[in-house]
Structure formats: C-alpha cells, structure tokens
Amino acid sequence: MNKLSTKLVVAIGIGAALYGILGLWGFSIAPNTFIKPALAILTVFGALFGPVAGLLIGLIGHTVTDTIAGWGIWWGWVISSGIIGFSMGLIQKRVGFSVKNGSFNKGDISYLAITGLVGIVIAIIFAGAFDIIVMGEPFDKIVIQVLGATISDVIVFLVLGLPLTIGLAKSNKKHAHLKIEK
C-alpha cells in the first residue's frame, strides 16, 4: 500500500475542513436537500491531489458537516460525497494533466466533466438507495431528494467546480514558465 505523503495528508485535512465547514451553507431546494457551493472544493482538491484525496476529503468533510449541524451522520450521503470526490480526482491520473503546472487540454476538461457528472449521478443514486434500504426512508421522499441533489450538485459542479479548476490551472500555466534571472 502506498504511504500518504505529509503534503497529501495536510491537503486532505485542509480540504476536509473547508468542505465540512462550507457544507453548512446552502440554498434549500427539496426536503433536506440544498445547493451547496462546497461541492466545488471536491472538484478543485480532487483535481489537484487525486482520487484518494478526493475520496477522503468527501468522507471526512461530510462527516464534519453532519456532526456540526447536529442532524446526525447520514452515512449514505457521507459515502456519496466520498464517491464524488474520488470521481473528481480521477482527472489527476491522466497523463499530461496537472492543475499545479497548468498542463491541460480540451480532452482533459471533457474527461473531468464526464467523470464528475457520472460520479455525481452514481453517488446520489447510491445515497438514495442506502436511505431506502438501510435507513428505512420513504421512497417518494428519497426520489425528491435524489432528483434535487443530483440537479444541485450538477449545477454547482458546472458553474463553480469546473470553472474554478480550469481557472486555477490557467493561472498556474502563466506562472509555470517564469524563470529566475541570474
């Protein structure tokens, strides 16, 4: 098993704290369902540090949100945040892609968009199924939550997460070619 570097552990801690605290704010769109801008944190940190970091940031951060909010930990939704973070981090495994160095192309952006959207859909369906099967939640309530959560997460991903990640990569590209003059 690969060891986690100190840098990666620190990034996971910072990402989880940001995701956990920012996850407390959102705009209600369905029963217990919110548009939460915090999802952009999973996109940026996943793209920067990879799928393992994205997974752990999602799991830890969502647990922090649920704990602080006081509504109990909803494990299906915690796991779904981990799945989303993992899917956002898959882009980091593409050869030649690097947010840190500003190295990306249209194919990378498409890949991030596709893996992000597929990850969101899989994660939210998992959370809904978990709530019905394990938590005994009513089917009709969960259908509304799943639809609302999917729509809200897709909106946040496309409007905030993807543009922030691309913007950060573009910004780093400008600075990657700077040289120290002697």
Curated annotation (Swiss-Prot):
Q: How does it sit in the membrane?
A: Multi-pass membrane protein
InterPro entries (alphabetical)? ECF_substrate-spec-like, UPF0397
Q: Where does this one sit in the cell?
A: Cell membrane
Q: Which GO terms describe its cellular component?
A: plasma membrane
Is Membrane one of the keywords? yes
Give a Pfam family name: ECF-ribofla_trS
Its main localization is membrane
| Annotated disulfide bonds | none
Q: State whether keyword Cell membrane applies.
A: yes
Sequence intervals crossing the membrane: 9-29, 40-60, 71-91, 114-134, 142-162
Q: Which UniProt keywords apply?
A: Cell membrane, Membrane, Transmembrane, Transmembrane helix
Tell me the PANTHER family matching this sequence: UPF0397 PROTEIN BC_2624-RELATED, UPF0397 PROTEIN SPR0429
* Cross-referenced HAMAP family: UPF0397
The record, for NCBIfam families, names: PRK13661.1 (NF010182)
* Family to which the UniProt record says this protein belongs: Belongs to the UPF0397 family.
Q: What is this protein called?
A: UPF0397 protein BCG9842_B2659
Species the sequence originates in: Bacillus cereus (strain G9842)
